[in-house]
Amino acid sequence: MIMKKKTILSVAFVVSLLPMLMNQYGGKKGVQEITGLVNLLNPIGIIAVALFVIGVWVPFKKEIIGKTLGALGVIGIVASEVYKFFTWHVLTITGELSFQHSIRLAFPEFYIGLVVSLAMVITYFIVVWKRNDEGIADSDK
């Protein structure tokens, strides 16, 4: 993968993680708020970030390995958000896995973050799989 693509993907990835700094979960705004960083600090989130960084920045003999690891990383962030959406409240508030509780206890910022993460998945595939300006794929060079 060329340096320009690596840089674009890295900047886009960091920008896509910014909504996690907002309060995404809680019982009531101003009383009980939990930032979206819990999405990154669970095992799925940590592994997803590592896969993205390795996939984009570590050179592999077969370029498809790097592309696949990077794709797993951005998809893993979405999976991490969905996982936390369904489970964060189970041990601390409700004691049960409930779709209704998950919806009721998620702030609008969660949905903003999820949409931004989904946009990052789309961006990743557009940037990685598109051909260069010369009409030559990266692997053809």
Predicted regions and their residues:
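Loop-to-transmembrane helix junctions at the membrane interface
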Residues: 55-88
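Alpha-helical transmembrane segments of multi-pass integral membrane proteins
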Residues: 11-22, 76-83, 116
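N-terminal signal-anchor transmembrane alpha-helix
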Residues: 2-36, 43-46
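Alpha-helical membrane-associated segments of multi-pass integral membrane proteins
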Residues: 5, 9-12, 16, 95-131
